[in-house]
Amino acid sequence: MNYSALLDAISQGPLARWASILPEQIAEGLSEERYGDLPAWKTVLAQLPAITSSHTELAERVSIGAPGDCDETTREQLQSVLEALIPWRKGPYWIHGIHLDTEWRSDWKWDRVLPHLASLKDRLILDVGCGNGYHCWRMLGAGAKRVIGIDPSPRFVVQFHMIKQLAGLHYPVDVLPVGIEDLPEKLHAFDTVFSMGVFYHRRAPMDHLLELKNALRPGGQLVLETLVINGKEGDVLVPEGRYAMMNNVWFLPSCATLLSWLRKMGFKAPRVVDICPTTTEEQRSTHWMRFHSLPEFLHPENPALTAEGHPAPIRAVFVAEV
């Protein structure tokens, strides 16, 4: 997991302040003392077979290579290595004839988001809470100059490096084992910042909005996707216990409430561009994620409610500028 190309690329320019402290942050984020499973995951990564890919498709889907690029024995080895890092949450990926059918149909989310964005061509992009980096690849496929994803989960980081090793190390896309709080204050560097599926996990929502704003250059665009509730301005659900079996869900505002929060934090022209109930077709258990998923998180007698009796998940996409 080599970041030297990234560090060289950002050592000058708007990310130089971050580049100076990033090696230490990466070392801490991939500390084997802190994450006991990391040595085993690194061993698995080293077992990834070397396959020359005949093509890589990123615009319409993430597809690497073709079945004919390797023999069946090599493909079985590849599948075994990929399975060693189950669960795979975000995707799907097509890799040398293997359909990596992840828990989330993250491509559906991308199809909902992309039409509402300023062009990503030649943009420097930050993807906060990016998981294994699926959307980072789609951003690159939409023409981005460089994409940096951040996620503090080392399993997701290793999964990303598996995909990058298969696709090609030359691609200007990286996933770093850090959180947004690790970025230097008032960096004002990125053309577009994405925060998708993160906001409701933040205990201090206004602080998160400020962190996102401080990462953007003047005129840059924020893309915020989060869980919401139906309601008027001022309405917010704060689950006292779990929400859809998750114990780290803090604030689910109405769309009108979150728009007011964005204005409060100084974002310009905040707007809702998509509202979509999460379905059991979009989030479900698969071979690549064999644990409970949305069908088990909903009320067994009323799928309009979570297992705890809260409104079932609705996700909205907000876009704003600074």
Swiss-Prot record:
* Catalysed transformations (reactions): carboxy-S-adenosyl-L-methionine + 5-hydroxyuridine(34) in tRNA = 5-carboxymethoxyuridine(34) in tRNA + S-adenosyl-L-homocysteine + H(+)
InterPro entries found in the cross-reference section: CmoB, Mo5U34_MeTrfas-like, SAM-dependent_MTases_sf
A Gene Ontology biological process term: tRNA wobble uridine modification
GO terms for MF: methyltransferase activity; transferase activity, transferring alkyl or aryl (other than methyl) groups
Residues annotated for carboxy-S-adenosyl-L-methionine binding in this entry? K90, W104, K109, G129, D151, P152, S153, I180, E181, M196, Y200, R315
Give the domain of life.
Answer: Bacteria
Q: What is its EC number?
A: 2.5.1.-
Coiled-coil annotated spans: none
* Pfam families noted in UniProt: Methyltransf_9
Keywords (A to Z) from UniProt: Transferase, tRNA processing
Concerning CDD domains, the annotation shows: AdoMet_MTases
Q: List the disulfide bonds.
A: none
What does this chain do? Catalyzes carboxymethyl transfer from carboxy-S-adenosyl-L-methionine (Cx-SAM) to 5-hydroxyuridine (ho5U) to form 5-carboxymethoxyuridine (cmo5U) at position 34 in tRNAs.
Q: What protein name applies here?
A: tRNA U34 carboxymethyltransferase
* Gene behind the chain: cmoB
